[in-house]
Amino acid sequence: MAAAAFAKRWEGRGYEKGESQTFWIELLTEIFGVESPSVFITFEQQAQLDHTSFIDGMIPSTHVMIEQKSLGKDLRQAIKQSDGSLLTPFQQAQRYSAVLPYSERPRWIVTCNFAEFDVYDMENPKGEPSRILLKDLEKEYYRLQFLVEQQGIHLQREMEVSMKAGEIVGKLYDAFVTQYDADDPQSLRYLNILCVRLVFCLYAEDAGIFGKRDMFHDFLAHYQTEDMRMALVQLFEVLNTPADKRSKYLNPSLAAFPYTNGGLFAEDIDIPQFTDELRDTLLQHASLDFDWSEISPTIFGGVFESTLNPETRRSGGMHYTSIENIHKVIDPLFYNDLRTAFEDCLEESNIKKRMQQLHALQDKMAELRFFDSACGSGNFLTETYLSLRRLENEIIKQIYSVEQLNAFENPIKVNIHQFYGIEINDFAVTVATTALWISEAQMMAETEKIIHHDIDFLPLKSYANIHEGNSLQIAWEEVCPKEELDYIIGNPPFVGYSLQSKEQKADLLNIFVDEKGKPYKTAGKIDYVAAWYYKAAQMMQNTNIHAALVSTNSITQGEQVAAIWKPLKEMFSIHIDFAYRTFRWDSEASLKAHVHCVIIGFSDAPTNKPKILFDNGQAIEAKNINGYLIDAPDVFVESRNKALCDIPLMTKGSQPTDDGNLIIEADEYEDFITKEPNANKFIRPFVGAQEFLNKKKRWCLWLVGASPSELKALPEVRKRVEAVREFRLKSKKEATRKKADMPTLFDERRASTTEYIIVPRHSSENRKYIPMGFVNPNIIASDAVLTIPSATLYHFGILESNVHMAWMRAVCGRLEMRYRYSKDIVYNNFPWPSPTTEQQAKIEASAQAILDARALYPDSSLADLYDPTLMPKELLQAHRQNDRAVMSAYGFSTKMTESECVAELFKKYAEMVE
């Protein structure tokens, strides 16, 4: 085993300066499978104290700081520092942490002497470290999993338990659904409510809420199958009845259950008769065989809703926001500040002042109000509540280590009444409310461990304000008054405009309106999620409300940027406070496609906090974050029919609209020519993105100028032409049906009479440069490419430069993550340089060098030549030479980063459009 081999190899060796980097690189690669350790971990990072010091190791993605010592050094003993102070290795690391930006501070500090690892969890900075010995690494390596997994083993366990819980709920659902009328919506509604109630009871018996473990099981176990239905009916009635209103003759086994309140058991629902299988599933599999007290309400809420949602079950599984992604929203929005405030309290040496500060912080937390306007199963609200309560428990622990608590006093102030939500699905509303109650019970149990006495959970005393309805048709202030609200959070639905229903399109047009109440012209071409941004911006006016939402990355790309962010800026003066640039969000459902998301935090309130861009695990401070999520001025690149600069016209290739009948594929070419040799004069190479990039062969029938007598003599061609006519006649589009009158011709014809440049409309995001190239006019370009007739080497050199690629990456749309090059956004808006004659000549020479380098590999496709791992040295050097020539023409330094380059291009663009 890798861990055993590593431990044996490092036994009895290790000195701080010479071997620590090798030690950690081998640990990460051999045991945890890190593929690029030089990227994953950084060594000797500077820390600016009153002198320059160096941090031994940092793992940014998992927020780990390493303080390494030589073999034999005592990790708990203070060591004299260069400034004369005496610090333990942990204190030394703490000092480094204190001077880092908050976003870069470690969650974990590891002190190590090659034989021992002391692990400090900074969620509990005063706690004792856990120690892992090198000699025990074979069995205990998993305790270092946090080095590579941000949420660590605990989250993995929560996930496993919650997913298992979802499976059990699915079994219960499947067992019950056969007893209900599956075609009756009301019956299915009763089934969903029944499942929620059963889960609450299963959790309550395992968590001790009912007073005695297995109480729910033991009560039902007394009943035979035929009596189970009535037993549940009676139990639900009792749970909904206060103790003083119950019959004094009530069966003692029922009377022992506490009053629940909260409305969970208020409605009379139809419960079907049980079968033996149903009884066994509930009592054995769901109750005795599983401990519900360990579930994560945040994860389970989503799993629960997905499990019981027939549409989701049919489409292939579960889909919910992970805890990690929720924290990407709430941590920079408010939670990091609260933790910093807590840590500041702990730094106060005066005990009286420290207690005052801790009480004030707890009071502040209890006054905060949170709103998720598309809350689904409540996972954002639930995780936010759990995070606040965990922090409050830390505060309570500190306070009551000094102050005495009255035996009847409840020290908890944060409560689920602070949380507001809107959700369109009635069942999801019930799940969200229940998930918050379970969260409350779990956190109350944690508080009880701190104060060493019990707090009554039942009857339920607090309620989350979850409202059922269409969030875009409800006045948000009616749900949560804006003067009371602090934060808007969530993951609203995103639906591309081409996939929106009539109702969704109507919602957008009703919301995305100008000062006169008229829909913006572009409102019909934006993602559905944009409506939530508009309503949030509207609500935060003249308040201190801050918002952060998970969204599709399309709202930060292409023409949607101007369509969405320009109105938000002009109407509401909002600014982006922080943002996560595009990251991939994988659904738990294996059948679902990957979703590419951004997270955007915004407000209209003035703030002194630095703006932060998160990208690939790095937190970068920005002067301004614009709608493209770039540190650059607020510039909106709008769709433009005519180029901003004096450059050749770009057009889309020719579109056949023929159902493939005017196209001759490579595998049918020989057969077609054999049957119709006289058609050869009308056959032209047909090149789209796939053909251009991958050296694939394809042809088309280009019948422009073909006379009736010529066509009459070509029976195979006539068959194809007739098929085109029939296909177009069946079209729903009137314009296409009209083109049935000219079935010999392409629907859209844009053949060039001169040599032209081809630009693929879609290209892999892994390429540094989009491959473009010159082709002769005999080639017919398909509508999968863009063409630039009459373009020169100079134009080619500019377009293939890193400057143009930086612009393209910033403003283009995306298909998943692939670049979507567009004429009206990317090309027509690009600010070209004004080179001298000498500079232009250099660009032409470097452009030719690119073509020459490609020509050295005639058997290689452009896809292979521009594969980052395969790109030939000559081609790479030619591109770099071209980059330098183009940057010189712009007056840019070759040391300029891509972000700096884009910022300068935005400035240049803004000047040109003024």
Show the residue positions of the predicted features.
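Metal-dependent nuclease catalytic cores in nucleic-acid-processing enzymes
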Residues: 24-29, 88-109, 435, 439, ...
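Non-catalytic DNA-recognition/assembly elements of restriction-modification systems
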Residues: 375, 574, 716-724, 739-740, ...
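A short, conserved, highly charged catalytic patch centered on acidic carboxylates
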Residues: 1-108, 122-126, 152, 744
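Flexible, glycine/threonine-enriched loop-and-boundary segments that flank and lead into catalytic domains
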Residues: 286, 351-369, 412, 454, ...
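Flexible phosphate/Mg2+-sensing switch loops adjacent to catalytic phosphate-binding sites
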Residues: 39-41, 214-219, 341-364, 388-417, ...
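Preference for the N-terminal adenyl/adenosyl cofactor-binding alpha/beta module
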Residues: 1-9, 86, 112-115, 134, ...
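Signature of N6-adenine DNA methyltransferases within the class I
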Residues: 45-53, 101, 108, 116-164, ...
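Polybasic, glycine- and aromatic-enriched phosphate-binding surface used to engage nucleic acids
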Residues: 94, 530, 607-608, 616-845, ...
